[in-house]
């Protein structure tokens, strides 16, 4: 019941005066309540701005009753006012109607002035107490209309603008968009560290001066800014013209074939050079002194003699080129022989070191963080250890470590560890197939007194190909565990120190198996022939 109706009823009946007074007090209390709460945006907006907006365009639950609808905008009354004729309107709607359409009520055309409008605080309080649904897509919350603005400030489904690309996204998605998806997010070139928007990265990568590119001729990897000099000066297989191309030799060949071409075509090049000199001679032949326009003088030198001297010099230089080429080939042969000798000595030293481990070998795998990153990026990681001997004489073995990819079936994100037999110096003096016990351990590198190593013990199975005498340098069949250790357990422990993983292999042949097994240790089943 509006305040106007209260006053009319008071004039007609004394018995209803108490009711009107109570209603007026209720309306007054509503005004105070709304002015104190400040929960709704309309209470905080200036009157000039309020006159420009219409009713509440929100979804009510249950639906809005018609008595709370503005007859002009057909939405829920905002800043409800009442006319002397008893109709309710949004303050902004009726004010605009009076100014634009004249001083009359839009419903019954009764004369209506702006100063005759008065706030309907009772209706305002009733409307602000109605339940509405959050208008943001995806949000299922409901609240009183008076709390809608506060909710929208914190609603995770409200639309906010991306400061980088100026597109709208829900608040719950904006951080992910800004960091991961926005085409205008700032990234840095991994090669030159220049910052740029992500959408420009592909274009930059195609021209980055510090990006690694592969020479199309020799396959050498260089940074882009070095490639022009590489093509022009260093690339051994880049096509180059003959040095005598200016004299008429039109052959093209790889740069590393140029010296041979010059050697094999010396006579041709000399003839071309002589012809060029002869042509120069003809163009510079002494002319008649009576022709000053040619610029010639009777005292010009003897060009024929000069040509003969140049030809003689070319012949001598040709001989020198042949001698230098022969010396270079001889030196190249000596260098190649020295390289083979050094390689042989390095192999012998490595073989001697492998024989000194006496069946206990610790494999240091450096840059292990790089291998873990490759595994996370689903790039295969397979590493082989250097060879080592079980004794002197003894069998030659090596280890193979495989980081299983996240997509691998049944063994995703596991370390696989295997042992392979190799061709060794003493194979002809040893009994085959190999028989013995092998203990594989990933060492705990903590400083604790008692270290939590991860280890497995396995017995050789002579019937498997993995333990037969190898016919090639390394037996392709291995013996070990596909699921030796999970990568999560590896990361949680202290197995990696200074970016290095330590893997220990202890081997005891059937003639030396005492003391290898720990009391009470039961080996689990292995994966053979992998």
Curated annotation (Swiss-Prot):
Q: State the Pfam families in the record.
A: TRAF-mep_MATH (PF21355), TRAF6_Z2 (PF18048), zf-C3HC4 (PF00097), zf-TRAF (PF02176)
| ZnF (TRAF-type) residues | 150-202, 203-259
Q: Name one GO molecular function term.
A: tumor necrosis factor receptor binding
Specify the domain of life of the species encoding this protein: Eukaryota
One GO cellular component this record assigns the protein to is: CD40 receptor complex
Tell me which residue ranges form RING-type zinc fingers.
70-109
Positions of region (Interaction with TAX1BP1): 1-362
Q: Where is the MATH domain positioned along the sequence?
A: 358-507
PTMs per UniProt: Sumoylated on Lys-124, Lys-142 and Lys-461 with SUMO1. Polyubiquitinated on Lys-124 by TRAF3IP2; after cell stimulation with IL17A. Polyubiquitinated; after cell stimulation with IL1B or TGFB. This ligand-induced cell stimulation leads to dimerization/oligomerization of TRAF6 molecules, followed by auto-ubiquitination which involves UBE2N and UBE2V1 and leads to TRAF6 activation. This 'Lys-63' site-specific poly-ubiquitination appears to be associated with the activation of signaling molecules. Endogenous autoubiquitination occurs only for the cytoplasmic form.
Class of this enzyme: transferase
According to UniProt, the name of this protein is TNF receptor-associated factor 6
């Amino acid at each position: 019941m509006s305040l106007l109706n209260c006053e009319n009823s008071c004039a007609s009946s004394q018995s209803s005066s108490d009711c009107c007074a109570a209603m007026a007090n209720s309306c007054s209390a509503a005004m105070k309540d709304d002015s104190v709460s400040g929960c709704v945006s309309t209470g905080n907006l200036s009157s000039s701005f309020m006159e420009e907006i219409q009713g509440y365009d929100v979804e009510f639950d249950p639906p809005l009753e018609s008595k709370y609808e503005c007859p002009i905008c057909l939405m829920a009354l905002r800043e409800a006012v009442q006319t002397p004729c008893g109709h309710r309107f949004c303050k902004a709607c009726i004010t605009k109607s009076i100014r634009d359409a004249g001083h009359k009520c839009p419903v019954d055309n009764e004369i209506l002035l702006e100063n005759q409008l008065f706030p309907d605080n009772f209706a305002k309080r009733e409307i602000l107490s109605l339940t509405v649904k959050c208008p943001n897509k995806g949000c299922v919350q409901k609240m009183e209309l008076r709390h809608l603005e506060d909710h929208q400030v914190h609603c995770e489904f409200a639309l906010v603008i991306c400061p980088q690309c100026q597109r709208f996204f829900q608040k719950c998605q904006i951080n992910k968009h800004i960091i991961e998806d926005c085409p205008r997010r700032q990234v840095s070139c991994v090669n030159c560290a220049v910052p740029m928007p992500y959408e420009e990265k592909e274009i930059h990568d195609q021209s980055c001066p510090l990006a690694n590119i592969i020479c199309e001729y020799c396959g050498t990897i260089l940074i882009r800014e070095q490639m022009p000099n590489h093509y022009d000066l260093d690339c051994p297989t880049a096509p180059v013209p003959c040095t005598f191309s200016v004299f008429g030799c039109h052959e093209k060949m790889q740069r590393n074939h140029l010296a041979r071409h010059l050697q094999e075509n010396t006579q041709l090049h000399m003839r071309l050079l002589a012809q060029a000199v002869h042509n120069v001679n003809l163009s510079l032949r002494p002319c008649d002194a009576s022709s000053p326009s040619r610029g010639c003088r009777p005292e010009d030198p003897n060009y024929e003699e000069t040509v003969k001297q140049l030809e003689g010099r070319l012949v001598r230089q040709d001989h020198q080129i042949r001698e230098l080429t022969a010396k270079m080939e001889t030196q190249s042969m000596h260098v190649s022989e020295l390289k083979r000798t050094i390689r042989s000595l390095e192999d012998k030293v490595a073989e001697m070191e492998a024989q000194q481990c006496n069946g206990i070998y610790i494999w240091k795998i450096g840059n292990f963080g790089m291998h873990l990153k490759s595994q996370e990026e689903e790039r295969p990681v397979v590493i082989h250890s250097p060879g080592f001997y079980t004794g002197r004489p003894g069998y030659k073995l090596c280890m193979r470590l495989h980081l299983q990819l996240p997509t691998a079936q049944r063994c995703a994100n596991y370390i696989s560890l295997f042992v392979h037999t190799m061709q060794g110096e003493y194979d002809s003096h040893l009994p085959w197939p190999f028989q013995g016990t092998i203990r594989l351990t990933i060492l705990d590198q903590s400083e604790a007194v008692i270290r939590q190593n991860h280890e497995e013990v396995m017995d050789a199975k002579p019937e498997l190909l993995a333990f037969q005498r190898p016919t090639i340098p390394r037996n392709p069949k291995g013996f070990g565990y596909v699921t030796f250790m999970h990568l999560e357990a590896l990361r949680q422990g202290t197995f990696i120190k200074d970016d290095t993983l330590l893997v220990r292999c202890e081997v005891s042949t059937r003639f030396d198996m005492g003391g290898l097994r720990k009391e009470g240790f039961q080996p689990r089943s292995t994966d053979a022939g992998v």
